[in-house]
Amino acid sequence: SGCRNYQGPAWYRKHFVLPAETKGQRVVLHFEAAMGKQILYLNGKRIQEHLGGYLPFTLDLTANGVQAGDSCLLAVFTDNSDDKSYPPGKRQYTLDFAYHGGIYRDVWMIAKSPVAITDAIDSQIVGGGGVFVHFDKISEKSAQVYVNTEVQNDDARSESVTVETTLTDADGKVIKRSSGKLSLKPGEKKSIRQQMEVKNPTLWSPDTPYLYRVQSRIKKGNKSIDGGITRV
């Protein structure tokens, strides 16, 4: 528009009731991004602060005592004023790109089993946490795929689960599948590393941006209790 972006504080308020079907699950609010500095208040109590506007962050409702059926008031303070303590670190009028303000990406309510894959950012492990996929010995003939999956047990009792990882092509055809068991004490989290070899891989390039899918499942017996898909 040719105008300067709005700079300064902004407030958001949301009333909600935690759905009854989340009973026995761990519930978090996942913010994809909000620009600048954010302070979160739950039912009038300051809960946490987050700096920076490009990475997601979460608010753990369960850890803050919210249970299924509870009525909640969430207040979010955001401020995209110039601040050297987080990127971009310079005055906005010197930037050659639009600098957002407020909550500019989606916010999700996520309910998980007490035994589940961790959040990659909340885990605070470099090169780990959540589902971390990396590669080695890549050529047109073969590629080694390594999948690290971190699982946490928030239950009050020890649990034994199976981590099942399936690699598929873009059409959903199964290429490789690997599974392994984890035993977790209450409050414990562990990682499992699984290796798969892909023959004649379709390599990504700007001209052929082909992506495979890594499907992760946490199983208790024959029942899937958590999971997700990572595009690689």
Give residue ranges: language-model regions.
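Accessory beta-strand-rich segments of carbohydrate-active enzymes
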Residues: 2, 6-127, 154, 170, ...
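Short strand-edge motifs at loop-to-beta-strand transitions and within beta-strands
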Residues: 12-14, 55-59, 180, 188-196
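Extracellular Ig-like/FN3 beta-sandwich strand-entry sites
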Residues: 24, 69-71, 142, 158-160, ...
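Beta-strand-rich binding/interaction modules
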Residues: 40-42, 140-183, 190-194
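Short, hydrophobic beta-strand segments
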Residues: 61-63, 193-204
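Hydrophobic/tyrosine-rich beta-strand signature of extracellular beta-sandwich/beta-rich modules
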Residues: 76, 165, 214-216
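Short acidic/polar inter-strand loop motif in beta-rich domains
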Residues: 78-86, 201-203, 219-227
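N-terminal carbohydrate-binding accessory modules
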Residues: 153, 215-232
